[in-house]
Amino acid sequence: MSIINLLTTIIPVLLAVAFLTLAERKVLGYMQLRKGPNIVGPWGLLQPIADAVKLFTKEPLRPLTSSIMMFIMAPILALALALTMWMPLPMPYPLINMNLGVLFMLAMSSLAVYSILWSGWASNSKYALIGANRAVAQTISYEVTLAIILLSVLLMSGSFTLSTLIITQEKLWLLVPAWPLAMMWFISTLAETNRAPFDLTEGESELVSGFNVEYAAGPFALFFLAEYANIIMMNALSTTLFLGGFHNSYNPSLYTTNFIMKVLILTMAFLWIRASYPRFRYDQLMHLLWKNFLPLTLAMCMWYISMPIAMSSIPPQT
């Protein structure tokens, strides 16, 4: 795998992240009956570039009592993991065609918890640490349901390879037979990426900023990029799992166009939800998962395991 292949994946992702921040501000603006950014460049299109220049040219301050090494490593790890998770995603051909691509993505999303924990702990601030603890508890909790939903979907697909899901869904989207799972998956991805109405770690309208409260300039920008890269990546994964695109081996570019449209629609849904819903209380957030989602997903998983056996067939083998 050459460095060019790597760059052709990473650079478009970072560009998409930059313009997603602009899209979010524009969408929120119009939903609140105002314009949003419209000064820098035509229709405010150069706003992300201005933001990036401002953030990366500021002096990266840090608290005097912070742990320097960990304080700097946490945002780097966050962005590195967010970009690594794009590798096994089929668009329609992945950067690295892994045999266990789904497990790799689960492992990487679990590792992302460490960057949050390190940033809160290394800041040597009680507010950052409390924010980090809340973020970690939320992320780990919702990973349980994400893993069970993934297992149920993979039982229908018959393989841990993401590319197989495209072939599985050529005739019918998995959204149709597994719509309860798809709904729970979408809500869990909102919680996993710390987005409204589950953004209790940041709580922009009440708290300061959560685990990254002590960060400024470049390191803060890295956290910001990682968060938005994760949002787009989760929507891309949702599309692969439940909204399998039209795939014609003679014209693979059609798949990519189809894929991009679906990811954009899901991302707009994320922004729409942020503009529409108030924040959950922390106990409601945990009750939703442990008392509602977990029993439901376990029951659905048992259903998808027992159905093929009851119908005297076996799960598909690849």
From Swiss-Prot:
Q: Which family does it belong to?
A: Belongs to the complex I subunit 1 family.
From the Swiss-Prot or TrEMBL record, what is one GO molecular function term? NADH dehydrogenase (ubiquinone) activity
Q: What is its main location?
A: mitochondrion
Q: Which GO terms describe its cellular component?
A: mitochondrial inner membrane
Catalytic reaction(s) noted: a ubiquinone + NADH + 5 H(+)(in) = a ubiquinol + NAD(+) + 4 H(+)(out)
Q: What is this protein called?
A: NADH-ubiquinone oxidoreductase chain 1
Would I find Zinc among this entry's keywords? no
State the function annotated in the UniProt record. Answer: Core subunit of the mitochondrial membrane respiratory chain NADH dehydrogenase (Complex I) which catalyzes electron transfer from NADH through the respiratory chain, using ubiquinone as an electron acceptor. Essential for the catalytic activity and assembly of complex I.
Task: Spell out the subunit comment.
Answer: Core subunit of respiratory chain NADH dehydrogenase (Complex I) which is composed of 45 different subunits.
Topology versus the membrane: Multi-pass membrane protein
Encoding gene, per UniProt annotation: MT-ND1
Record InterPro entries = NADH_UbQ_OxRdtase_su1/FPO (IPR001694), NADH_UbQ_OxRdtase_su1_CS (IPR018086)
Q: Does the keyword Transmembrane helix apply?
A: yes
Q: Which HAMAP family match?
A: NDH1_NuoH (MF_01350)
Name its cellular compartments: Mitochondrion inner membrane
**Any Pfam family the entry gives:** NADHdh
Q: Which residues cross the membrane?
A: 3-23, 68-88, 100-120, 147-167, 172-192, 217-237, 253-273, 294-314
Query: PROSITE patterns attached here?
Result: COMPLEX1_ND1_1, COMPLEX1_ND1_2
Which top-rank group of organisms is this from? Answer: Eukaryota
Q: Which UniProt keywords apply?
A: Electron transport, Membrane, Mitochondrion, Mitochondrion inner membrane, NAD, Respiratory chain, Translocase, Transmembrane, Transmembrane helix, Transport, Ubiquinone
EC number from the UniProt entry:
7.1.1.2
| An individual GO BP term | mitochondrial electron transport, NADH to ubiquinone
